[in-house]
């Protein structure tokens, strides 16, 4: 049985969890995340609530991983990007009027 190395990553605003995992060839994304023990390190990660990808491309939990893959667990957005931009433009216009 051949062993491959993958990286499992979960980033928060102030801390990043990066875990190197040695796992059998033919394993799935779910197997690598479970082996990384990331689910026990933080309560924010869930298979049902977080999207998962490899190098910024969304994949399913049953996706077969390859040697050197970087498995990324994505956080949910706290605000809609359009709403954030709208608020940001409003604030910048308001600040310009003051000066």
From Swiss-Prot:
InterPro entries: Mopterin_synth/thiamin_S_b, RnfH, RnfH_sf
Protein origin, superkingdom: Bacteria
A Pfam match: Ub-RnfH
UniProt record similarity statement: Belongs to the UPF0125 (RnfH) family.
NCBIfam families (alphabetical): PRK01777.1
Name this protein carries in UniProt: UPF0125 protein BU253
The organism's taxonomic lineage, starting at the top: Bacteria, Pseudomonadati, Pseudomonadota, Gammaproteobacteria, Enterobacterales
